[in-house]
Amino acid sequence: MNLKSVSVSQIRPEVSEILVPGEDIIQCFQTVRDQVLFTSKRVFVVNVQGITGKKVSYYSYPYSKVQYFGIETAGVLDIDSELVLVFSDGNRLQFDFKAGVNIKGICAGISKYIL
């Protein structure tokens, strides 16, 4: 599913308990149930599972472990954009964003923390 931009007030309340002091949420995105947060220290993924949504997984991907990343901007027929992050351990994350999301802004934000 494609991610759409949401405000910080729409993130799951328990996320604030997991962030470390001095860590700021820069951008937030979500699908129907899952969320992806770009903070000043990491990419944080909230994966809501099951029919009731009571089971939730939290994944932290620190910028310090990003080996490289790339973006694919929206085109004429393909209006969605994409971000790929590759980590030093070989793991790869791919996020697809709905039309209208500033993928270049996300790229600039990540660059600020990993370069």
Where are these regions (language model features)?
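Anionic N-terminal interaction surfaces
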Residues: M1-V36, R92-L93, K98-G100, K104-G105
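Charged, low-complexity, helix/coiled-coil-prone segments
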Residues: N2-V15, F44-Y58, K112-Y113
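Hydrophobic transmembrane alpha-helix bundles
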Residues: E14, Y63-I71, D96-F97, I110-L115
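Phosphoinositide-binding peripheral membrane targeting modules
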Residues: I18-Q35, T39-N91
